[in-house]
A protein has these predicted regions:
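Conserved alpha-helical segments that form or flank metal/cofactor-binding pockets of metalloenzymes
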Residues: 54-57, 71, 75-103, 107
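Histidine/lysine/aspartate-rich catalytic loop segments that bind and position anionic ligands
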Residues: 97-123
Length: 166
């Protein structure tokens, strides 16, 4: 089974390992990831193939953060877009924008984030998440006020689930 979506990764320092050259451990982890909610291997998993145990552990964290977190898929995808823009990560942006829009984030909101502008007409959750992530980026911490708003809306576990994305 070819697990990989090839493209720009072919030009990387650590390109995808062809199936025929994978170790048994690499194949096992690749099969597990491909059978999960992602359905394929791409992005950061390409270089991580060189350390299958680390890749497996990280993908489980990522699977939780993406598919099982307590803030909801729409909110977590919105957060991913903000962070992808803050850190100039076009691959993450390309992967997650369609998911965010499918989950209900407006295209105009995505466009504003892509252009580095604060979106107009955000939902209450989007406004809170945007403020949290901007404050973290700018101050490397949250004020008591912002933390209190985040905690009130999502609880302790939600605070951790959201900030862990960052």
């Amino acid at each position: 089974m070819n697990h990989l979506k090839l493209g720009a990764a072919e030009l990387d320092r650590m390109p995808a390992i062809p199936d025929a050259q994978m170790t048994a451990e690499q194949k096992k982890v690749m099969d597990e990831i491909a059978a999960g909610p992602r359905g394929r291997i791409g992005g950061p998993f390409i270089p991580l193939m060189r350390s299958p145990e680390l890749m497996n552990r990280l993908q489980k964290v990522g699977e939780y953060l993406r598919f099982q977190n307590t803030v909801g898929l729409r909110n977590s995808e919105f957060a991913v877009l903000i962070v992808a823009r803050q850190w100039s990560q076009p691959i993450e942006w390309a992967i997650h924008r369609p998911i965010a829009e499918k989950e209900g984030v407006l295209p105009a909101t995505c466009d504003a984030i892509a252009e580095g502008r604060r979106p107009d007409n955000m939902t209450d959750d989007e406004t809170l998440i945007y403020n949290v992530l901007e404050e973290l980026r700018n101050n490397r911490s949250l004020s008591d006020t912002t933390y209190g708003q985040l905690h009130k809306r999502f609880g302790e576990q939600g605070v951790i689930d959201l900030v862990a994305h960052y």
